[in-house]
Amino acid sequence: MKSAIFAAAVLGAAGVSAHGYVSKAILDGKEYTGYLPYEDPYHNPPPERIFRKIAGNGPIEDLTSIDLQCGGWQNSGSAPAPLTAEPVTPGTVQKLQWTTWPDSHKGPIITYMARCPGDCSEYEPGTDAVWFKIAEDGKHDDGSWASDPLINDVPYEFTIPEGLAPGNYIVRHELWALHAAWTYPGAQVYPSCFQVKVVGDGTQQPTNLVAFPGEYTPDTPGVVYDIYQNNEPYPIPGPPVWTPA
């Protein structure tokens, strides 16, 4: 009950402005503007992006919804973007800048990739198991969370795995907010997808592929977690991070 009362106060204070999305990516040093849900649809023609459309700055709470994949609408949960980023090199650090993030919205940050069978601008994964996890960060030993640096507008950094075979890929990046996750539904997932071309001489193809929706259920460890009263380590949802052999 205490968790519910405290979270209600947090939610009331935070309001809609507490929500967010990826506003830009810096990939191999080149800057790409994210999909801007409150600007792009009102341009004629809309600007072409490497990011797939999102409905707005709000979260996904229904883990069975196709919107969980990339944050789109029900009829186009991961509608392809018209552009693909210029080639990126495995082993390099990439950066994602979020809009201002509230300090009440604690949670993990998880990043996946999926190989496109051809041009990513013509590919929708649907519910196929095509995703592999490349990075995750959750609750730290000192009680801080992966999401905390975003409060100060610090970009999130991740690395394209070394050894990954060249090709066209979708990067699926998600931020969780657990301020109401003591029950299901309650956890808020903020997914974002963009398209990249990986180059290099890598030969490895990940296994242990998962689907979105499909991988997360109400019973998945980490989906229900009381950040106000649970002092145990946080189990990050999803499969293990893929590690090249």
UniProtKB/Swiss-Prot annotation:
InterPro entries: AA9, AA9_LPMO. It catalyses: [(1->4)-beta-D-glucosyl]n+m + reduced acceptor + O2 = 4-dehydro-beta-D-glucosyl-[(1->4)-beta-D-glucosyl]n-1 + [(1->4)-beta-D-glucosyl]m + acceptor + H2O. Pfam families: AA9. Residues 1-18 form the signal peptide. Disulfide bonds join C116-C120. Lignocellulose is the most abundant polymeric composite on Earth and is a recalcitrant but promising renewable substrate for industrial biotechnology applications. Together with cellobiose dehydrogenases (CDHs) an enzymatic system capable of oxidative cellulose cleavage is formed, which increases the efficiency of cellulases and put LPMOs at focus of biofuel research. Induction: Expression is up-regulated during growth on wheat bran compared to that on glucose. Keywords: Carbohydrate metabolism, Cellulose degradation, Copper, Disulfide bond, Metal-binding, Monooxygenase, Oxidoreductase, Polysaccharide degradation, Secreted, Signal. Coiled coil: none annotated. Binds 1 copper ion per subunit. It is an enzyme of class 1 (oxidoreductase). It is found in: Secreted. Its main location: secreted. Its EC number is 1.14.99.56. GO terms for molecular function: metal ion binding; monooxygenase activity. Cu(2+) binds at H19, H105, Y190. Lytic polysaccharide monooxygenase (LPMO) that depolymerizes crystalline and amorphous polysaccharides via the oxidation of scissile alpha- or beta-(1-4)-glycosidic bonds, yielding C1 or C4 oxidation products. Catalysis by LPMOs requires the reduction of the active-site copper from Cu(II) to Cu(I) by a reducing agent and H(2)O(2) or O(2) as a cosubstrate. Active on hemicelluloses, including xylan, glucomannan, and xyloglucan. Has no activity on ivory nut mannan (INM), a linear beta-1,4-linked mannan without substitutions. Belongs to the polysaccharide monooxygenase AA9 family. This is AA9 family lytic polysaccharide monooxygenase B. It comes from Malbranchea cinnamomea (Thermophilic fungus).
